[in-house]
C-alpha cells in the first residue's frame, strides 16, 4: 500500500474551512468577493428551497428581494412588480410628498380582493371623465352611481367596450347614454365571501363584479384582472386586506412629518428612514415620533455598519435595519468621507448583534450577482436591497436612450449632485441641505437595458434556490442556523482564486445569464 493512503475506512474527516466567526475574526474588512461558501450535502431539489424571510419584526416576505428607494429605481411600476413576485419596493422620496403618496396609492390599489374605494362616477359625468380616470389610474371599468360616490344606488357601469370606438367629438357624451344599465349587470350581495364572489365573476364572464347591499347601494367591487393576477403570482406580498405591500422612504427632518402623514393616509405598510449614516439624533427622534403617532407602522432604520450604530436604533424601537455604507456601485462615500465598511463584514457584524433582539437586517449595496445575494443571506441578512441590479429594467423610472447603438437608462446615486439638484430630500439624506458647497457622495451614470424584471427576478429566485441547494440548506432560516451553529463553512479567496473563479483562458465568450 502506498504510504500516503490511510487505511481503516472513511470515518475520519479533517476539519475544513472556517466558521463565520473565524472568517470575520481578523481585522481585515471583507467584501462578497473575498470569500466562498463550501458546499454541503444535497438531498432535495432546488424548487423545494423555502425563501420566506422577515423584512421587519411583523412583515414577512416570500422572496427576500427589495428594490431600493432611489429615483432611478423605484416608483409605482417597480414596487408593483416586486410585490407581485414576493418581494417589496420602497418608493423614493426625491420628489414632492404628494407625488410619493400617489405612487404608494397606485401600488395599494393595483391588486385587491374587495375594492372598497374604487373610482366612481355619476350618469352626469362624461366619456372624457372616464378617459381621464383611465389615464390616471390605468383602468376603465368604472361603476356608475346616482351621486357618483360609494354608498349611493348603483345605476350602471362603464367599461372600455362601451367607449372604445367613440370619436373625439363624442367625449362630451354623458355616461347615462353609453353605460351598461343596472338591469344588465351581474352583482353580488353584501356579505358574500371572496371565494363566492370570485366564483360568480368566473361564471358571469364579466370584467367587474359590483357588490351591493339590500338597498342596491354600491359597497365594493371585484375585478377579473385581480383573479388572473392571483393565479399568475402565487408568491405576491399582500396585507390583511389582500392589497399589495408597499414601502416608502422618508427623511428625518421636521418637514418629513407631513410627508409621513400623506404616506400613511395612502396606506403605506412600512417606512424606511433614509439616511447615509443612521446613527444620529435626528433619526432616533424620528423613530420615537413615528412609534408614538403611528404605533402600527413598521419602521426600518439605517444605514448602519457597526453594532454600536445598530444598538442606538434598536433601543429607539426600529423594526428592521438597513446595512451598508459606501458600497453601492454609484456611491463614493468611502472615497470622499473616509467612512464606511466593506459590506461582507458589515452585514455579518450587524446581523449577529441585531438577531439577539429579533431585528431583521437588510443587506443594502454591493450586490452585483446572484452569488452575492446568496452570500449576504448566508452572513445573516434576512433580505437584500438592490439598486444597480434593477436599474435600467423596464419597470425602473426614466426613459431609454441610445448611445453608440446601445440602449441605456440613467442610473444615479442619491448622493450625486444630479439627485441633490432635483430635490432637497437627497441633500437631507447626506446632512448637506444647509451647506453652501455641496459634497457629492455619489455619481451619475447609465446602465444597459436589462428588459423586464418579470424575467430577471425569477432568475434571481432560481439562483438563490440553487445556491442554497449546493450549500445543503432547505430554507433561508436553515441557512442562517447553519451559519450561527458553525456548520456552514467559508474560505477566503486570494486574488488569484478570484480570477480562477471567473471566466478565463478564452479568446472570446458570450455571458448569457438567463
UniProtKB/Swiss-Prot annotation:
Because IMPDH activity is tightly linked with cell proliferation, it has been recognized as a target for cancer and viral chemotherapy and as a target for immunosuppressive drugs. The activities of the antitumor drug tiazofurin, the antiviral drug ribavirin, and the immunosuppressive drugs mizoribine and mycophenolic acid (MPA) are attributed to the inhibition of IMPDH. In addition, bacterial and parasitic IMPDH's differ significantly from mammalian enzymes, which makes it a suitable target for anti-infective drugs. It is found in: Cytoplasm; Nucleus. Mycophenolic acid (MPA) is a non-competitive inhibitor that prevents formation of the closed enzyme conformation by binding to the same site as the amobile flap. In contrast, mizoribine monophosphate (MZP) is a competitive inhibitor that induces the closed conformation. MPA is a potent inhibitor of mammalian IMPDHs but a poor inhibitor of the bacterial enzymes. MZP is a more potent inhibitor of bacterial IMPDH. Subject to product inhibition by XMP and NADH. Also inhibited by ADP. IMP type I is the main species in normal leukocytes and type II predominates over type I in the tumor. Induction: Constitutively expressed. The gene is IMPDH1. This is Inosine-5'-monophosphate dehydrogenase 1. The modification Omega-N-methylarginine is found at residues 341, 355. It is linked to Retinitis pigmentosa 10: A retinal dystrophy belonging to the group of pigmentary retinopathies. Retinitis pigmentosa is characterized by retinal pigment deposits visible on fundus examination and primary loss of rod photoreceptor cells followed by secondary loss of cone photoreceptors. Patients typically have night vision blindness and loss of midperipheral visual field. As their condition progresses, they lose their far peripheral visual field and eventually central vision as well. Residues 114-173, 179-237 form the CBS domain.
